[in-house]
């Protein structure tokens, strides 16, 4: 990147999204609202909350060639493959393919007599899958996956979802190259439009990542997999761990209070991965759920070290867990709110780098909302 651009970025990055450091507020929730059981807090124990640690959620595996261990993978949340196929058949569906299961249930591509278009069935225990289904039933936006139907058989809930050709992770892997800036901005705009809508409904997704962005084409993208979503959230709250460590925001990793700004951080990681493929900001993801929980501390240290977070970029609240636990690891060699040095190695387009930098503001109060980001010139002109 030319020095002229670097100087421009430094000036650009010295500004913040808002004059104040108060978290954004969202408008009241319009009816209808998800009818979630009042006894459900949505904040389970840390070790139970990592809802999806798969890579390439839409990677296909032949139904008849699945590993034997997969057959035995039926714990209290995931029905066995045979049971899931029986449930699908009882509703008139013929399973074509099985997809990588999440922790909430089996995922299968299926067709129904008289309906040639394939659909995706997400089949799981009623408690967890039904909560996700009730949430999706009450949302309606082109950038959020649309639930076609909810079917119940005993203790099993089956969600019927549209079938997309790929997820963004698989799309990037197959393309094996960076997505051009104009296409990446079109995709990111749809993601942010979906988040703006969800946040206005007081829903935070909590697991925005390339695996959970479904795509048919550059201009047909949606946010999917609401197994980790939380409702209702406006003010920062103690919501526990959820999602995926390498895309979690600092405040989530620190187990501090957080709100919708956590989704903005994750969407910033998605944009970076589109523009910098195959480079990633934070390498070496853990491989087991236990390692995910244990690695929150090391991941947060990695963020501070990689981005060279200045102490002035920490939240102003001295009682914040992020401040109390991690400000001692901050770095002084980089001035606050200036370009992250690690961006130099990937040579991002200036518009893309500006957006990623804004979305990866370490202090959530300085992170723009989806509404603010969509007002930026690079999106307004699309």
Curated annotation (Swiss-Prot):
<dbReference type="GO" id="GO:0052150">
    <property type="term" value="P:symbiont-mediated perturbation of host apoptosis"/>
</dbReference>
<dbReference type="InterPro" id="IPR011009">
    <property type="entry name" value="Kinase-like_dom_sf"/>
</dbReference>
<dbReference type="GO" id="GO:0106310">
    <property type="term" value="F:protein serine kinase activity"/>
</dbReference>
<dbReference type="GO" id="GO:0005524">
    <property type="term" value="F:ATP binding"/>
</dbReference>
<dbReference type="InterPro" id="IPR050660">
    <property type="entry name" value="NEK_Ser/Thr_kinase"/>
</dbReference>
<feature type="compositionally biased region" description="Acidic residues">
    <location>
        <begin position="45"/>
        <end position="75"/>
    </location>
</feature>
<feature type="compositionally biased region" description="Basic and acidic residues">
    <location>
        <begin position="1"/>
        <end position="10"/>
    </location>
</feature>
<dbReference type="InterPro" id="IPR008271">
    <property type="entry name" value="Ser/Thr_kinase_AS"/>
</dbReference>
<keyword id="KW-0945">Host-virus interaction</keyword>
<dbReference type="Pfam" id="PF00069">
    <property type="entry name" value="Pkinase"/>
</dbReference>
<feature type="binding site">
    <location>
        <begin position="99"/>
        <end position="107"/>
    </location>
    <ligand>
        <name>ATP</name>
    </ligand>
</feature>
<keyword id="KW-1035">Host cytoplasm</keyword>
<dbReference type="GO" id="GO:0039525">
    <property type="term" value="P:symbiont-mediated perturbation of host chromatin organization"/>
</dbReference>
<dbReference type="InterPro" id="IPR000719">
    <property type="entry name" value="Prot_kinase_dom"/>
</dbReference>
<feature type="compositionally biased region" description="Polar residues">
    <location>
        <begin position="12"/>
        <end position="24"/>
    </location>
</feature>
<feature type="domain" description="Protein kinase">
    <location>
        <begin position="93"/>
        <end position="379"/>
    </location>
</feature>
<feature type="region of interest" description="Disordered">
    <location>
        <begin position="1"/>
        <end position="75"/>
    </location>
</feature>
<keyword id="KW-1048">Host nucleus</keyword>
<keyword id="KW-0723">Serine/threonine-protein kinase</keyword>
<feature type="active site" description="Proton acceptor">
    <location>
        <position position="207"/>
    </location>
</feature>
<keyword id="KW-0547">Nucleotide-binding</keyword>
<feature type="binding site">
    <location>
        <position position="122"/>
    </location>
    <ligand>
        <name>ATP</name>
    </ligand>
</feature>
<protein>
    <recommendedName>
        <fullName>Serine/threonine-protein kinase US3 homolog</fullName>
        <ecNumber>2.7.11.1</ecNumber>
    </recommendedName>
</protein>
<dbReference type="GO" id="GO:0042025">
    <property type="term" value="C:host cell nucleus"/>
</dbReference>
<dbReference type="GO" id="GO:0030430">
    <property type="term" value="C:host cell cytoplasm"/>
</dbReference>
<dbReference type="GO" id="GO:0004674">
    <property type="term" value="F:protein serine/threonine kinase activity"/>
</dbReference>
<comment type="similarity">
    <text>Belongs to the protein kinase superfamily. Ser/Thr protein kinase family.</text>
</comment>
<keyword id="KW-0067">ATP-binding</keyword>
<keyword id="KW-0418">Kinase</keyword>
<keyword id="KW-0808">Transferase</keyword>
<comment type="function">
    <text>Multifunctional serine/threonine kinase that plays a role in several processes including egress of virus particles from the nucleus, modulation of the actin cytoskeleton and inhibition of apoptosis. Phosphorylates protein 26 and 29, two critical regulators of capsid budding from nucleus to endoplasmic reticulum, thereby facilitating virion egress. Modulates and redistributes host components of the nuclear envelope, including LMNA, emerin/EMD and the nuclear matrix protein MATR3. Phosphorylates envelope glycoprotein B (gB), probably to direct it to the cell surface.</text>
</comment>
<keyword id="KW-1122">Modulation of host chromatin by virus</keyword>
<keyword id="KW-1119">Modulation of host cell apoptosis by virus</keyword>
